[in-house]
Amino acid sequence: MARDKEDQNNENPSIVQNMSFPFNTIFLISSAIFLVTAAFWFVAVMTLHYRTDECNRFVTTPGIFISFSLLAMSLTGFYAAYFKSDCLFRIHFFIFFLWMFVVVSKAIFVIFLHKETNPRLFPGTKIYEFRYEDYSGWVSRLVIKDDEWYRTRRCLVKDNVCNRLNHKMPASEFYQMNLTPIQSGCCKPPLSCGLNYEKPNNWTVSRYYNNLEVDCKRWNNSADTLCFDCDSCKAVIIADVHNTSFSITVNIIHIIFSLCIGMTGWFAWLRILRESQK
């Protein structure tokens, strides 16, 4: 009787296979969803990239790389699961490991950036100031490239980031303003310079002038100069990258989600290999 049952199982191998978890089906569905999403994102980013000016392309350029990587990974994963192709699975996981390397590296960078972004509240005001020297050398070099700073500077001037501070206001009102990081670092001199306040973008030398600080010498009342050449301006650009990056929690969730999809694909691949050996 036991032999009859064994023969029945051999005649109906699909019963045993159907009892196992359907990793291949789940991976096929998830890859299809990823494929549609990545394709839509890729088209949207490419369209936005060619419609924006040079100043905004530093945002869309990484988006092209990310969306193309997701598109390639999803496409190979979908066809690998659909055709049960060992070769396509290998290509898929090669792209997946590259993707995970980028995601983990970005998460580490965000953690370091979060630890080093520490604005100081200037006494007696509501103005926070940023210091370029607070950032590690590798962090500052990664975000701020000296040979490309002129492009960033030109874009800041072109976008009129300091326009809000053009009108005259009392010093007491200015010192209680909630300035954005760029307004604080690029549109006014460091308050430690000891300059006399005339209006937000106009300051004059006083007897308390601090000529030892390099940024104090770089300040100019000209609308095309202001503090765009200051280290404080470079510091707030780094801080702005921190503010526009995903939070640490979101990065961790992103890593966990990617690993779950990757493990599902891995088990689907193992099952296909096992079936091909039978």
From Swiss-Prot:
Any one GO CC term of the record: membrane
Pfam families: Tetraspanin
Extracellular side: 47-62, 114-249
Transmembrane segments: 26-46, 63-83, 93-113, 250-270
The protein's role, per its UniProt record: May be involved in the regulation of cell differentiation.
Residues annotated as glycosylated: N202, N220, N243
Protein name per Swiss-Prot or TrEMBL: Tetraspanin-13
UniProt lineage: Eukaryota, Viridiplantae, Streptophyta, Embryophyta, Tracheophyta
Native species: Arabidopsis thaliana (Mouse-ear cress)
Signal peptide: none
Membrane topology of this protein: Multi-pass membrane protein
